[in-house]
Amino acid sequence: MAIKRNQGSNPKPEKKERLTKAETHQEQDNLEESIRPHSFDEYIGQKDLKDVLSIVIEAAKTRNEPMDHLLLYGPPGLGKTTISLILASAMGVNCKITAAPALERPRDITGLLVSLKPGDILFIDEIHRLNRLTEELLYPAMEDYRLEITIGKGQAARTRSIPLPKFTLVGATTKVGSLTSPLRDRFGLIQRLKFYEPEELALIIKRTAKLLNTSITEQGAAEIGRRSRGTPRIANRLLRRVRDYIQVKKFDSITQELAAEALDIYQVDPQGLDWTDRLILDTMITQFNGGPVGLEAVAAATGEDAKTIEEVYEPYLLQIGYLNRTPRGRVVTTVAYQHLGKTGEEQLSIFSEQ
């Protein structure tokens, strides 16, 4: 299989590295490539999704035809790209990887489509961000395996139809509701990736540690797993930070105590909240009495981008019950108050009931 990429709580603490974001693109890519599982046997977690895709793969191979187009949705860092590569490996085809922001002009997507071989997989990340012209070019490509190109303008314009080999489009999105109905309806399979359980993350961490030649105890892996926000990408990143810590401190293995010490330094607490999570919650509590408050108001008060708050931080805060969305806005929950050591639960409960 060939892989091709198209380039295109308390008082506010001192700000530390944000572990929900990449340190450098190259560093992250190198790490992910070195530890990426190559089959569903190696892929930990997402059992229901793996069962479905295993059936789809076997059926497609039996009929000697490509898989149906697949839409994967869920929070970032859960393994959408990895799944597309595993699918390509299982089908014995190439996988071309791109992202919607890189497909600005019609020729960007047409160049990719005409370069596909029979059965190839085209993976488009952030597919909800496709512009209208690019999206409309995909309609006949997905449905009829042809590319409709308009040549000329005005009355002299004419349409040329170019046949395409049968291929599989795998789209990935964090905002499935932002896809247009015509695009969403052309996917034969729509599957959601869920946050991982701490036990699953501990298994991922142990596997990664072995590949990185780093010794780690069961308890050490569990400690990192608990603080990884249900996300393998973050688990692997935290593991690397803890590995740095034990190497500098001259320890031989990652234990629970050392993992906790290291992650406390990076201000990743036992619930997986980092500096920005606590800033968001603290701002909502101190400036907006816990809510309800709109997303734009939170963004303005914290200095964070509204889209980043909504797509990167909110999903986990909602998942663990620290934040609620109401028709009037976001509301901090009682358990979040308790975790941050704040008071004001009675006032919070009044807002929650409205």
Curated annotation (Swiss-Prot):
Binding-site list for ATP: 35-36, 77, 80-82, 143-145, 186, 196, 233
Name recorded for this polypeptide: Holliday junction branch migration complex subunit RuvB
Region Head domain (RuvB-H), annotated ranges: 270-354
Gene3D superfamilies for this protein: 1.10.8.60, P-loop containing nucleotide triphosphate hydrolases, Winged helix-like DNA-binding domain superfamily/Winged helix DNA-binding domain
Function description: The RuvA-RuvB-RuvC complex processes Holliday junction (HJ) DNA during genetic recombination and DNA repair, while the RuvA-RuvB complex plays an important role in the rescue of blocked DNA replication forks via replication fork reversal (RFR). RuvA specifically binds to HJ cruciform DNA, conferring on it an open structure. The RuvB hexamer acts as an ATP-dependent pump, pulling dsDNA into and through the RuvAB complex. RuvB forms 2 homohexamers on either side of HJ DNA bound by 1 or 2 RuvA tetramers; 4 subunits per hexamer contact DNA at a time.
Compositional bias of kind Basic and acidic residues: 12-36
Residues binding DNA, per UniProt: 325, 330
Annotated region (Disordered), positions in chain: 1-36
Residues spanning the signal sequence: none
GO function term, MF aspect, one: four-way junction helicase activity
Family: Belongs to the RuvB family.
Region (Small ATPAse domain (RuvB-S)): 197-267
SUPFAM superfamilies: P-loop containing nucleoside triphosphate hydrolases, Winged helix' DNA-binding domain
Stored CDD domains: AAA
Gene Ontology biological process terms, A to Z: DNA recombination; DNA repair
GO annotations of cellular component type: cytoplasm; Holliday junction resolvase complex
Protein's organism: Crocosphaera subtropica (strain ATCC 51142 / BH68) (Cyanothece sp. (strain ATCC 51142))
